[in-house]
Swiss-Prot record:
GO terms for cellular component: cytoplasm. Belongs to the class I-like SAM-binding methyltransferase superfamily. RsmB/NOP family. GO terms for molecular function: RNA binding; rRNA (cytosine-C5-)-methyltransferase activity. Specifically methylates the cytosine at position 1407 (m5C1407) of 16S rRNA. Its main location: cytoplasm. Its EC number is 2.1.1.178. GO terms for biological process: rRNA base methylation. InterPro entries: Methyltr_RsmF_N, MeTrfase_RsmB-F_NOP2_cat, MeTrfase_RsmB-F_NOP2_dom, Nol1_Nop2_Fmu_2, Nop2p, RCMT, rRNA_ssu_MeTfrase_F, RsmB/NOL1/NOP2-like_CS. It catalyses: cytidine(1407) in 16S rRNA + S-adenosyl-L-methionine = 5-methylcytidine(1407) in 16S rRNA + S-adenosyl-L-homocysteine + H(+). It comes from Cronobacter sakazakii (strain ATCC BAA-894). It holds the Pfam family Methyltr_RsmF_N. This is Ribosomal RNA small subunit methyltransferase F. CDD domains: AdoMet_MTases. It is found in: Cytoplasm.
Amino acid sequence: MAQFGSVCLPEAFLDVMREAMPAGLAMDDFIAACQRPLRRSIRVNTLKISVDAFLAQVAPYGWQLTPVPWCPEGFWIERDDEDALPLGSTAEHLSGQFYIQEASSMLPVAALFADGNTPARVMDVAAAPGSKTTQIAALMQNQGFILANEYSASRVKVLHANISRCGIHNVGLTHFDGRVFGAALPEQFDAILLDAPCSGEGVVRKDPDALRNWSPQSDQEIAATQRELIDSAFHALAPGGTLVYSTCTLNREENQETVRWLLARYPQAVEVLSLEALFPGADAALTEEGFLHVFPQIYDCEGFFVARLRKTASVEPLPAPTYKVGAFPFTPLKTREAQAVIAAARKVGLEWDETLELWQRDKEIWLFPQAFTPFIGKVRFSRTGIRLAEIHNKGYRWQHEAVVALAGSDNPLGFELSAEEAQEWYRGRDVWPQTVPDADDVIVTFQHQPLGLAKKVGSRLKNSYPRELVRDGVLFSAPV
């Protein structure tokens, strides 16, 4: 077991890396890169704010932002106040204006959208914690439909929280082993991202002990699962569709060999789409097949692998599943009921377009993306779209996730809070503004972004921020 500073790099692992690394890269540089702290990076959420507006907004903070070459919304970030104020406690993060995302993990989604077209139906097979799902949603501009699947039950809640914070309403969440989708949803998706579970050899800069229990045998076992996952994903992909396969590991068995296995299995139905032109400088990580094999010393980021494939023809379907999905517990609202909901929502500043449809379950009113409808009855969804409201005393109790997703920036009915008042809001406390709004139900904003819906009670604004989101400790204190 070799120890390099605080980083554990087993000798057998280094042997595998020597074999996997192209001739133009040096092992000494690889080891040195593994010992350097990982640079922090963020991605601007363009569903909330444009990149230019974000840069102008944070300019007074003194943040040093270096563009990520493969993601126009991505930046490496250096901050003088990093020790005093966690990045996740800044106002911009709390309101969903950016996502903390490792730079190399922005690569798979960049590859998925490399042709400039916007797919209508997308699946993210292993979605938690949500960095890539939220990146996909932003590039789709909240249109179409994304099936975001996560096998780990404990991570589904985090996935939903991140989707909600970013104001996304075109996602349906599922909780399955990713190997079910080829049979359950054959040829249903225009684009699929399989960021596969892997041995994590590329994340050692984030976790110095990530490789302490590494073994070649575990790589082979994981690769066997990856082949089953990529086969299932390929069956779920429509002819003409794009499949991006990625990992945060570096050995060939889980990367090139997994893709080659798929190419050999369906030689007449799949082709490689080279990533040579994905961004200036991509050639430094390009393999002879057209994949990107990113060793950490190339771009000073985590290790990663990305392959982009096109399905050129249908393949023989897998046996149809025998399970029963169960009755769908929602019914679409009738026209008159829908009109009443739309009118009431507009009075408080919530609006949406015709790509979202109103559905009801008991006293809950939901908004589902139109593109979700064909999937009803085919698999069970944990949740879809956004919960808009609950019917309450012949009126509506608007839900936090709906306000964050639908109110938009610069809402004319929004009530702008001061920095101190916004901090109180995030701490779950009522706000006592100097001037009181006219409306009883009011969207409170900060930096012109919706924070939630408050109810006026006398001269105070009653806080409705969800208890599970309440923040303690130091919150944003940067100039505004």
